Amino acid sequence: MTVQTFTPNQTTTLETAKKTIAEQSQNSQTTGNKIGFVSLGCPKNLVDSERILTQLRTEGYEIVNSYHDSDVVIVNTCGFIDSAVQESLDTIGEALKENGKVIVTGCLGAREDEIRQVHPNVLGITGPHAYQNVLEHVHQYAPKPAHNPFTSLVPDHGVKLTPKHYAYLKISEGCNHRCTFCIIPSMRGDLVSRPVGEIIGEAERLKNAGVKELLVISQDTSAYGVDTKHSLGFANGSPVRHNIKALSEELGKMGIWVRLHYVYPYPHVDEIIPLMAEGKVLPYLDIPFQHASPRVLKMMKRPGQAERTLERIKKWREICPELVIRSTFIVGFPGETEEDFQILLDWLKEAQLDRVGCFKYSPVEGAAANEIEDQIPEDVKQDRFERFMLVQQEISAAKLQKRIGSTMQVLIDEVDDEGAIGRTYADAPEIDGLVYLNGETNLKPGELVNVVIEHADEYDLWGSVLHDAQ
């Protein structure tokens, strides 16, 4: 059984909601009622979709790739920003028009009244990570088929919506923070960490299935284990603490790429950097700083010591010179002055971050930031966004120019009749840069190759494979 994903063109400047249609290979035998599935939003939502699909396949349902062939369509929604809400509502409407039998889940599902007001005819609505409730709705409108263990086989690692060579590994659910621009805690609740043994077991199954890269995700990755008071757990019979350092050490033993995402800038993040220097996890840190002005950070309810953060970044790079830092920022936050924005630009120039995404602030229903006075006009937001990205573009271009002439390991993502496309340790899938290998048509997705970097632009690299070195 194979799973393919379909995503729209991605950019490195804005992480918008992404639509994923689940498609099972056509040589799978029909084993029961047919389910269509649309997944919207972030990688954390994608993992929820994978879990639902895995359970459906385990129960004998067939997953199909068209509205017309589906007995029921499930839409896993995103509700983080207004544009994501609109995309979710539009997708629900499309599914109702094309099929008529729709079950809604995901973050927007936590706002049932809003969905019912626009689409009163949906069959059922559940909130995020309400897997059992989704299945109950499916059972009601598409009863369980007769289960045949010989035609309903599901791989040990479950159904995945990513390419075979990388997978998202979700380590916790929810968040204890109350950032004023965010409503995730109201939809997904407070932090709940997965047992460490369960996480390691899933990671091992993924590795055994051919996964070469694990992307560790959650709402707040560095808070892993806080809710358990960092209690002692067990993985493969050995004691392991429920904290991000111990978990990273265990994942690092597997001999595949381990990439940490959504790391909140707690002081104990400093403890992870030596693991990166030792090669146990990738020297890549996705850490959303959001802003640099102390005044704006205070309004956001984010850590406000920007100068201290610069000192930490300097120390991290001294410990691990190869460290790549990715971050996201919000411009046009309510009350942001030109002086605040200039502080951000100056900080960005000083920090010299490798990869950066930027959002123009968008009001989110229920967010505390909506009550802040001095909402910023859209034209000012756009101007600041463009100025911000111009500064970062220059930083990124200069950093990538320094890669020319070096040899880097590249993980191949795609191959066609023109060549191959891959990524270095410095680039996460879909949100960062790419490495183009023109003419390399004999490579395979998931293959690791050594590449001499020959050319660079603002975000991407071009190079040639060192075949003798393989």
From Swiss-Prot:
It comes from the Bacteria. Residues 33-143 form the MTTase N-terminal domain. Pfam families: Radical_SAM, TRAM_2, UPF0004. InterPro entries: Elp3/MiaA/NifB-like_rSAM, Methylthiotransferase, Methylthiotransferase_CS, Methylthiotransferase_N, Methylthiotransferase_N_sf, NA-bd_OB-fold, Ribosomal_uS12_MeSTrfase_RimO, rSAM. Keywords: 4Fe-4S, Cytoplasm, Iron, Iron-sulfur, Metal-binding, S-adenosyl-L-methionine, Transferase. One of its GO terms (cellular component) is cytosol. It catalyses: L-aspartate(89)-[ribosomal protein uS12]-hydrogen + (sulfur carrier)-SH + AH2 + 2 S-adenosyl-L-methionine = 3-methylsulfanyl-L-aspartate(89)-[ribosomal protein uS12]-hydrogen + (sulfur carrier)-H + 5'-deoxyadenosine + L-methionine + A + S-adenosyl-L-homocysteine + 2 H(+). It is found in: Cytoplasm. The keyword Metal-binding applies. It is an enzyme of class 2 (transferase). One of its GO terms (biological process) is tRNA modification. GO terms for molecular function: 4 iron, 4 sulfur cluster binding; aspartic acid methylthiotransferase activity; metal ion binding; protein methylthiotransferase activity. HAMAP family: MTTase_RimO. This is Ribosomal protein uS12 methylthiotransferase RimO.
